């Protein structure tokens, strides 16, 4: 950790126009699924293992201030706007940066000023999204992603990084660079109190419910949520690097791997059978349908007799 003045992300230039994630991309196909919320839990765990991020979220995040469910929903809302929001995506990127700018504090570990916009930490937040998704191919699609697919995922991850004003100097440009970057981060990541709290909640199946929920219903809700909480645990721990599991003091058995694989095989079958309306978040569903409708219109336009006239340019 270094001083905030040395580490804060520079303000974006006014003439920078970030590219948006294509709505027919792999990123758009998978980010909008309901299981994204579960898979991304592994990314959040890795973020909580970064010392700067851990201290900042420990002070400022609702995850550790009595509203973890609300924080998760708002985070997913934000990610969906980055990916499917169109012009709103740019506004959301600006909002996220502005929201994090005032989050500064004196580190209890080093005594130095730290910031939510610490470049190393801010890069790590976005990089974990790629790392988890690239490693999650066996769960998401039933096989490892190909090199070409990983290149596409990283391309869109870099687009999101720019959208969120992440400093791009040193940000990985290839899958190999990302792998090397991950190796350099292993020693930085720690079993922070925040990460250990998250892991303990996963192991015990504890859920902090909204104060509006009657306490008499807590036991029933815990029972109803037990299968989902087990899936959450398996997904997060199963996607963590073994070295990170060791730091957090958790193991991973062959039986747990088989159980996780079986569950996601069932989920993939359900996704193939169920209509998209039931498998995607509403914003993702409507954005993808809107894009598909426009693409079909373009295809119909190509059949116009006017395009057969010599000298006519096809748009």
Show which residues each predicted segment covers.
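Mature, function-bearing regions of proteins
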Residues: 1-315
């Amino acid at each position: 950790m270094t001083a905030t003045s040395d580490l804060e992300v520079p303000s974006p230039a006014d003439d920078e126009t970030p590219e948006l994630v294509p709505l027919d991309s792999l990123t758009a196909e998978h980010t909008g699924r309901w299981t994204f919320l579960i898979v991304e839990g592994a990314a959040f765990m890795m973020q909580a293992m970064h010392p700067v991020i851990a201290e900042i979220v420990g002070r400022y995040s609702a995850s550790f201030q009595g509203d973890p469910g609300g924080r998760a929903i708002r985070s997913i809302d934000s990610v969906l706007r980055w990916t499917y929001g169109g012009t709103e995506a740019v506004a959301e990127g600006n909002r996220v940066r502005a929201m994090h700018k005032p989050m500064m504090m004196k580190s209890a570990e080093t005594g130095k000023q730290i910031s939510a916009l610490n470049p190393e930490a801010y890069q790590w937040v976005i990089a974990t999204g790629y790392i988890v998704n690239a490693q999650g191919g066996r769960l998401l699609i039933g096989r490892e992603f190909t090199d070409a697919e990983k290149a596409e995922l990283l391309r869109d991850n870099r687009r999101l990084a720019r959208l969120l004003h992440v400093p791009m100097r040193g940000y990985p440009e290839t899958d190999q660079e990302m792998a090397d970057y991950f190796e350099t981060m292993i020693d930085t990541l720690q079993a922070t109190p925040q990460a250990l709290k998250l892991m303990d909640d996963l192991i015990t199946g504890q859920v902090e419910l909204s104060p509006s929920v009657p306490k008499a219903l807590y036991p029933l809700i815990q029972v109803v949520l037990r299968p989902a909480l087990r899936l959450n645990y398996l997904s997060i721990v199963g996607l963590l690097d073994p070295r990170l599991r060791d730091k957090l003091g958790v193991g991973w058995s062959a039986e747990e791997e088989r159980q996780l694989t079986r569950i996601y095989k069932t989920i993939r079958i359900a996704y193939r059978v169920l209509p998209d309306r039931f498998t995607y978040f509403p914003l993702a569903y409507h954005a993808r349908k809107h894009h598909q409708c426009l693409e079909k219109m373009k295809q119909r336009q190509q059949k116009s007799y006017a395009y057969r006239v010599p000298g006519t340019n096809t748009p």
